[in-house]
Amino acid sequence: FEAKVRSTVLPGSGLSSSAAFEVLIGRILNGLFAGGAVSAIEIAQIGQYAENVYYGKPSGLMDQMASSVGGLVYIDFADPKNPIVEKVDYDFAHSGYTLCTIDSGADHADLTDEYAAMPVEMKAVAAFFGKEVLHDVDEAAFYRHVAEVRKVTGDRAVLRAIHFFNENRRVKSQVRALKDGD
């Protein structure tokens, strides 16, 4: 097939331009050759594979899932092969808010090594506790042993773990607030 694509998403801006393109191609192929049988989650997973292998970017699945599923969603990646996706209905306009996307002027196109370091460092923290991924580490145990973890894995790995725990808590709180109209 031939396709001409035009986008206003700035490449390398952190707005998931590659994920949006991967999902677009996945949806086209799904419609042309699979009769729409491929799920949004599978299209996202295929897009992640393309991101990792073709583009050489060590991305997770979040950007592709957001592009593929669409709308405001909560995604639990505890099982990356079977993520739990929950649509979050919230009418920003009805509440007097507007959700905006801005161009920060920052380009992250050359940060591949930094992105690749994230899962490595988070897995190092998990390994300290005998786990494979940070999701399986008890947060209270992490904080009880943070000094030892820091000696073994380094400052940046500890900061990433703290960020991981804080973000997971924040997201759950925000989803609850949106559902409650708060």
Region roles according to the model:
Residues 74-182:
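C-terminal nucleotide
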